């Protein structure tokens, strides 16, 4: 992680040097005798690097260290009235060992989630970070021991992501389950709430596991209400008609959302279609959280790390 800060500081120092040179050029000559168009050019040449400097500083040092709780409501046709108002805490892509994702941040995740008093907590994969120039591997037992303090009357359920399987999916699963978190890998679980019930269906990660979407959903009794969980939202088009809602993560919201451009890089074969937030398509609802950590580059810009409290209504 130290290398990530060295990299970011090197960029900032380069921008500062460039800005200094521009300011020197900006002040050369008799300002009163310079044509107006040249004044505009010089001013722009000074201001633009300053804006870039601020954006880089924010993206590497400020925004990745933020964490917000975001409230979302999804209205689903034919959602059972007895399940109206179900509140699910959605957490994804923690990536322990990445920039700013340490014991203190894990404690903050737990505290902020518990303050919201959700009915159910779902963890959508990628608890691990690789050993790289900007992150270091933290054993899954560390993350799981922190997450065991999550509190919800209906329990805490999880799926695994590609980074978990690239490390050791079996070890990550054992760590979570040893700390009271049930992992659903092409498995289902019935949740009873108030006077009704619904089923969670955990779908295996798309990038690293064989796909058995229809077979997994078929484990749920016919006519039952289903909330599907997975790491990668690209499975969304493959959902059977009986699944009204899929919760996913993986994309990090693109990590960088540039004004007028959007998200240049999204790890999805559908481009930016499933980048983040709520989408309704072909009778199904999809919700994708932007997650908490980072990967590839230790940067977030206009994509704030989040915990989502999702309320489902009929």
Go through each PLM region and give its residues.
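Conserved beta-sheet core of the metallophosphoesterase superfamily
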Residues: 178, 233-309, 314
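Extended recognition/assembly regions associated with phosphoester-bond processing machinery
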Residues: 11-15, 21, 53-56, 73-75, ...
